[in-house]
């Protein structure tokens, strides 16, 4: 017996297994090599979604159903290896949400942690627990678990962002709760930008008391993130596997900005090719700027601004930028690290 071989099935064993089944029992040795694998094994598949194709379908959806009727008008980025499960990886969800000028996505809250990464348009607002923020392309916005949130588009342009949630994790633990607010728009009790000013300047209020596990900042503006990357670029210090890669953090503890999802931004200079890398956290990428290609296992995907692609767990990956490129990404790394599962391999 080993982790790669199953014991032979004899007539006597087969009869025994049939008797076990009628009593809701099963022999571990028949499935051990499937539940304890020698390396990560998943149905999650490498894939790329072209934004222009998805946008066309989103705009068509906008003619068929309102944001209010749908609660959230979203097209799920469903991994082709995980059909029917509403997942982009085994543990994470992704979707593209459209909100048209004048529309409101009503206030609600739920157990799931959510991120919004703005892909197209600009000027729409998200409100979280009494504070409203105006969103622009490249902004990383957090909705903590059980926080009231709504979306309003007072601009004259459609806006599309990527939703990233830990839906499969919450489903795994059977811990999903959700409720509506009763009104479309929640009461605004704090000025726009309050949380960034209060917690995003290397200071904290003297009487601060932590609430929850998420970052108290809920909008990380792309303008500031891009400036940081540009300044660090001058040092000419490039990680061979990542280029210049930074993690969005919770200023209270320096850890990931969200309790179950790690989020990153990275710069790949023109003609930079990363060395082979793999890690156990399947990762979703959204291209902010530039173009290039990524080899995932034995497949090569060519990408450009606004496209989305996914790298499954433990697949070897190499990025190559044909122009200066900036990528946003998110994964379940922080959850894996807290549980002692996470592993990486370079070269």
Swiss-Prot record:
Variation of activity with pH: Optimum pH is around 8.0.
Gene null: resulting phenotype: Knockout mutant can still grow on minimal agar plates containing gentisate as the sole carbon source but GDO activity cannot be detected in uninduced cells.
Temperature and thermostability: Optimum temperature is 50 degrees Celsius.
Residues covered by the Cupin type-2 domain: 96-163
InterPro entries, A to Z: Cupin_2, GDO-like, Gentisate_dOase, RmlC-like_jellyroll, RmlC_Cupin_sf
Domain of life of the source: Bacteria
Outcome recorded upon mutating residue 260 to C: Loss of activity
Pfam family, one: Cupin_2
Known outcome of mutating residue 17 to C: 1.6-fold increase in relative activity towards gentisate
S-S bridge residues: none
Induction per the UniProt record: Shows relatively high basal levels of expression under non-inducing conditions. Induced by aromatic substrates, especially 3-hydroxybenzoate.
Catalysed transformations (reactions): 2,5-dihydroxybenzoate + O2 = 3-maleylpyruvate + H(+)
Outcome after substituting residue 123 to N: 25% decrease in activity
GO biological process: catabolic process
Keywords attached to this entry: Aromatic hydrocarbons catabolism, Dioxygenase, Iron, Oxidoreductase
Molecular function (Gene Ontology), one example: gentisate 1,2-dioxygenase activity
Keyword Secreted: no
Family stated for the protein in its record: Belongs to the gentisate 1,2-dioxygenase family.
Subunit (UniProt): Homotetramer.
PANTHER family: 1,2-DIOXYGENASE PROTEIN-RELATED, CUPIN
Function of the molecule: Involved in the degradation of gentisate. Catalyzes the conversion of gentisate (2,5-dihydroxybenzoate) to maleylpyruvate. Exhibits broad substrate specificities towards alkyl and halogenated gentisates.
Protein name (database record): Gentisate 1,2 dioxygenase 1
Designated gene of the protein: xlnE
């Amino acid at each position: 017996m080993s982790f790669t071989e199953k014991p032979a099935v004899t007539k006597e064993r087969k009869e025994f297994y049939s008797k076990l089944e009628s009593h809701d029992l099963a022999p571990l040795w028949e499935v051990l090599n499937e539940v304890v694998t020698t390396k990560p094994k998943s149905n999650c598949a490498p894939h790329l979604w072209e934004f222009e194709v998805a946008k066309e379908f989103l705009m068509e959806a906008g003619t068929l159903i309102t944001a209010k009727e749908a609660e959230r008008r979203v097209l799920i980025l469903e991994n082709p290896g995980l059909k029917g499960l509403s997942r982009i990886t085994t543990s994470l969800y992704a979707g593209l949400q459209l909100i048209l000028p004048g529309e409101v996505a009503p206030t609600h809250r739920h157990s799931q942690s959510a991120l919004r990464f703005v892909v197209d348009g600009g000027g729409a607002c998200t409100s979280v627990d009494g504070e409203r923020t105006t969103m622009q392309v490249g902004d990383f916005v957090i909705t903590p678990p059980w926080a009231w949130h709504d979306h309003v588009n007072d601009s004259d342009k459609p806006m599309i962002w990527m939703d990233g949630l830990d839906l499969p994790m919450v489903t795994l633990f059977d811990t999903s709760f959700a409720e509506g607010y009763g009104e479309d728009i929640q009461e605004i009790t704090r000025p726009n930008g309050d949380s960034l000013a209060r917690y995003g300047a290397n200071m904290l209020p003297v009487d601060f008391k932590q609430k929850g596990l998420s970052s108290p900042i809920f909008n990380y503006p792309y303008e500031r993130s891009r400036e940081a990357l540009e300044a660090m670029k001058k040092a000419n210090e490039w990680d061979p596997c990542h280029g210049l890669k930074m993690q969005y953090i919770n200023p209270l503890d320096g850890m990931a900005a969200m309790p179950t999802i790690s989020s990153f931004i990275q710069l790949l200079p023109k003609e930079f090719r990363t060395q082979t890398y793999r890690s156990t956290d399947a990762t979703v990428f959204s291209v902010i700027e530039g173009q290039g290609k990524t080899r995932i296992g034995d497949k090569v995907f060519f990408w450009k601004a606004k496209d989305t692609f996914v790298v499954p767990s433990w697949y070897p990956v190499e990025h190559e930028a044909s122009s200066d490129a900036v990528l946003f990404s998110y994964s379940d790394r922080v959850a894996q690290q807290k549980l002692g599962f996470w592993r990486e391999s370079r070269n």
